[in-house]
């Protein structure tokens, strides 16, 4: 007996899981890590709650050149950018700006460029 439905044996593969994973990682990072970073660097240190000597130039450079520090800085710059550009790409579609593949490539190329620049700048330290 033959089934009544056809199974597509070579389904079209989508690249959306890649973009959605970067979108999700960027959103999570932006929601959980960025507020703490802003609190510490933008409020607590200037108010004197945290000693400014703790963030002296030498200590910051040694942190930024360590593997953990470099990954933290790269993730802080790159992941929210992937999140934002994914939102821009889908927001343009929602606003009826159907840019197709060109818009997709432009949005994700900008996020990739910012990510690459973050890596380059870390290696320049």
UniProtKB/Swiss-Prot annotation:
GO molecular function annotation: succinate dehydrogenase activity
InterPro entries, per the entry: Fumarate_red_D, SQR/QFR_C/D
Transmembrane segments: 30-50, 60-80, 105-125
Gene Ontology CC, one term: fumarate reductase complex
Annotated localization: Cell inner membrane
Keyword field: Cell inner membrane, Cell membrane, Membrane, Transmembrane, Transmembrane helix
GO BP terms: fumarate metabolic process
Coiled-coil intervals, chain numbering: none
Pfam family, one: Fumarate_red_D
CDD domains: QFR_TypeD_subunitD
Recorded topology in the membrane: Multi-pass membrane protein
Record Gene3D superfamilies: Fumarate reductase/succinate dehydrogenase, transmembrane subunit
Main location per the UniProt record: membrane
Assembly behavior: Part of an enzyme complex containing four subunits: a flavoprotein (FrdA), an iron-sulfur protein (FrdB), and two hydrophobic anchor proteins (FrdC and FrdD).
Family, as annotated: Belongs to the FrdD family.
Function: Anchors the catalytic components of the fumarate reductase complex to the cell membrane, binds quinones.
Name the UniProt record assigns to this protein: Fumarate reductase subunit D
């Amino acid at each position: 007996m033959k089934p009544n439905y056809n199974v597509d044996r070579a389904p079209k593969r989508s690249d959306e899981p890649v973009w959605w994973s970067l979108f999700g990682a960027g959103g999570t990072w932006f929601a959980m890590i960025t507020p703490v970073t802003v609190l510490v660097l933008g409020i607590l240190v200037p108010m004197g709650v945290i000693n400014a000597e703790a963030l002296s130039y030498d200590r910051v450079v040694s942190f930024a050149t360590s593997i953990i520090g470099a990954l933290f800085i790269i993730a802080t710059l790159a992941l929210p950018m992937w999140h934002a550009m994914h939102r821009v790409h889908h927001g343009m579609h929602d606003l009826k700006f159907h840019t197709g593949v060109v818009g997709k490539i432009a949005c994700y190329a900008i996020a990739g460029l910012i990510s690459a620049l973050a890596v380059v700048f870390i290696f320049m330290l």
